[in-house]
Amino acid sequence: MKPERVDLRGVANVDELVGRVLQTRLREARTLTVGLELRDKQSLHDFRIACKRLRYALERFQVLEPSLEQIADRLALLQDALGEAHDRDMLLSILPPTMPATERRLQTERAELVERSSALWSELERMMQALDSHRT
């Protein structure tokens, strides 16, 4: 999935630039939260990549707005959980059919990791809303 292009036309100052970049990356991630509902490999992977882009943008600008660091740190935890779920998907795809107990364990772990990811995203949404209300 390609990143959404950030429209910087008419940007007059650093605050506007930061706002446009973060709004674009956040919109991209929010659009792909459907992966948390669908729970399929590709949708979760796309959501993870969008979260990574958002995190990198936050890290880039945290020198200007230190409160972004906490959100970036939480996004890293979300990425880790989604990455672990992806690892379970890969293991399940190569697991021999003669290992049903291992398959059940991996499926359970994956489901728990996706649930954790969903909870982390909900927490992140609250953090980002608080940041938005603080900035306006």
Map each language-model feature to its residues.
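Function-determining surface determinants
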Residues: 1-136
